[in-house]
């Protein structure tokens, strides 16, 4: 009836009703029952693509080995894995990090621009300070004022990231920046 009325269809990816399991580099073993998801729309009625198919194709083309994203994308990962399989492509490693919160435990929304990296840089924070802080916040490691990029990256281990939300501390960031500037 919709087609007869001239309405164009959108295209969905048919999910099998099964449990998808993967070893998340932060969360550990994750199981997701696909019957709890509706078949994701890949192409809108106007022919434009939604995020999912282009994202997976880009990951395949660029030979992405690790995908690190927020824990709000766990359900996306379940059907992205199915799209990788349908395309007979290697499935990358996935890691889903917890959200960054303020000191009261409230999450930072995308619409709150005050905590953007650009704003932190404009406030005088060094690039190495921001990187060092962000890759270590919420980990079991002490945040030290490494000033050499190779040292920061060499000391990073994704296994140190906690499953719990990390609390952003302007005080710790300021102190770290001060230490970096002294070195």
Question: Where are the regions a protein language model picked out?
Answer:
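Active-site cores that bind ATP or allylic diphosphates and position pyrophosphate for catalysis
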Residues: 1-108, 116
């Amino acid at each position: 009836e919709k087609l007869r009325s001239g309405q164009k269809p959108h295209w969905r990816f048919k999910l099998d009703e099964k449990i998808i399991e993967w070893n998340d580099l932060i969360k550990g073993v994750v199981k997701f029952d696909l019957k709890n998801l509706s078949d994701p729309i890949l192409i809108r009625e106007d022919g434009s693509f939604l995020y999912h198919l282009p994202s997976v194709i880009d990951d395949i083309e660029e030979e992405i080995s690790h995908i690190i994203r927020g824990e709000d994308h766990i359900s996306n990962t379940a059907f992205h894995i199915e799209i990788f399989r349908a395309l007979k492509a290697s499935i990358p490693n996935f890691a889903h990090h917890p959200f960054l919160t303020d000191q009261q435990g409230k999450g930072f929304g995308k619409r709150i621009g005050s905590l953007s990296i650009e704003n932190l840089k404009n406030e005088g924070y060094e690039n190495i300070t921001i990187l060092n802080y962000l890759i270590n916040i919420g980990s079991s490691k002490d945040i030290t004022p490494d000033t050499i990029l190779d040292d920061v990256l060499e000391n990073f281990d994704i296994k140190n990231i906690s499953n719990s939300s990390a609390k952003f501390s302007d005080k710790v960031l300021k102190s770290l920046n001060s230490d970096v500037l002294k070195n």
